[in-house]
Amino acid sequence: MTVLAGTAFAWGMNWLRQSRRSWQPAAVAVFSFGLLLPLGEMIRLHPYQYTHFNHIAGTVRGADDRYMLDYWGLALKQASDGLREELIDRQETAPKGRKWKVAVCGPQRPAQVALGPDFTIGWDSHSADFAMTLGEFYCKGLTAPVMVEIKRDDVVFARVYDIRGRSISSLLAIPAP
């Protein structure tokens, strides 16, 4: 598709050069403007620019209900960094004799790498201190205090909840039939 678009643009520029040379700068300006529109959107979404959807698809906001946006779970890295910063700001330390426990709904490896050795990562939300969830359909929205929220363009990519002292049966949502 890209080759076809490039060929069509080159053909159009050649045609303009031969028949309406004075229109070439305007054509280049329109073409450049067309390239800058999605670039601006991707800059706003950074580092999640791979989730960009054009205006025909409804942008990221419109696509959020129809598609998995952060299927790689990269927002969990930023959420992990936010959790570590929040714990430092609050001057909280792990309970005596154990590491912080984080239940993760989504790919666990990004959170595990970002959090490091001071945290235990797993699925079990019963004994966890925190819950880290992707903003995807399969992760349940919890009624617990939100410690960290990763948002772009009004779309939640990830959240970290403080679930200490709460009974959370599962982080997985039951999809509608």
Residue ranges and their predicted role:
Residues 6-53:
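Signature aromatic-anchored transmembrane alpha helix within multi-pass, membrane-resident enzymes
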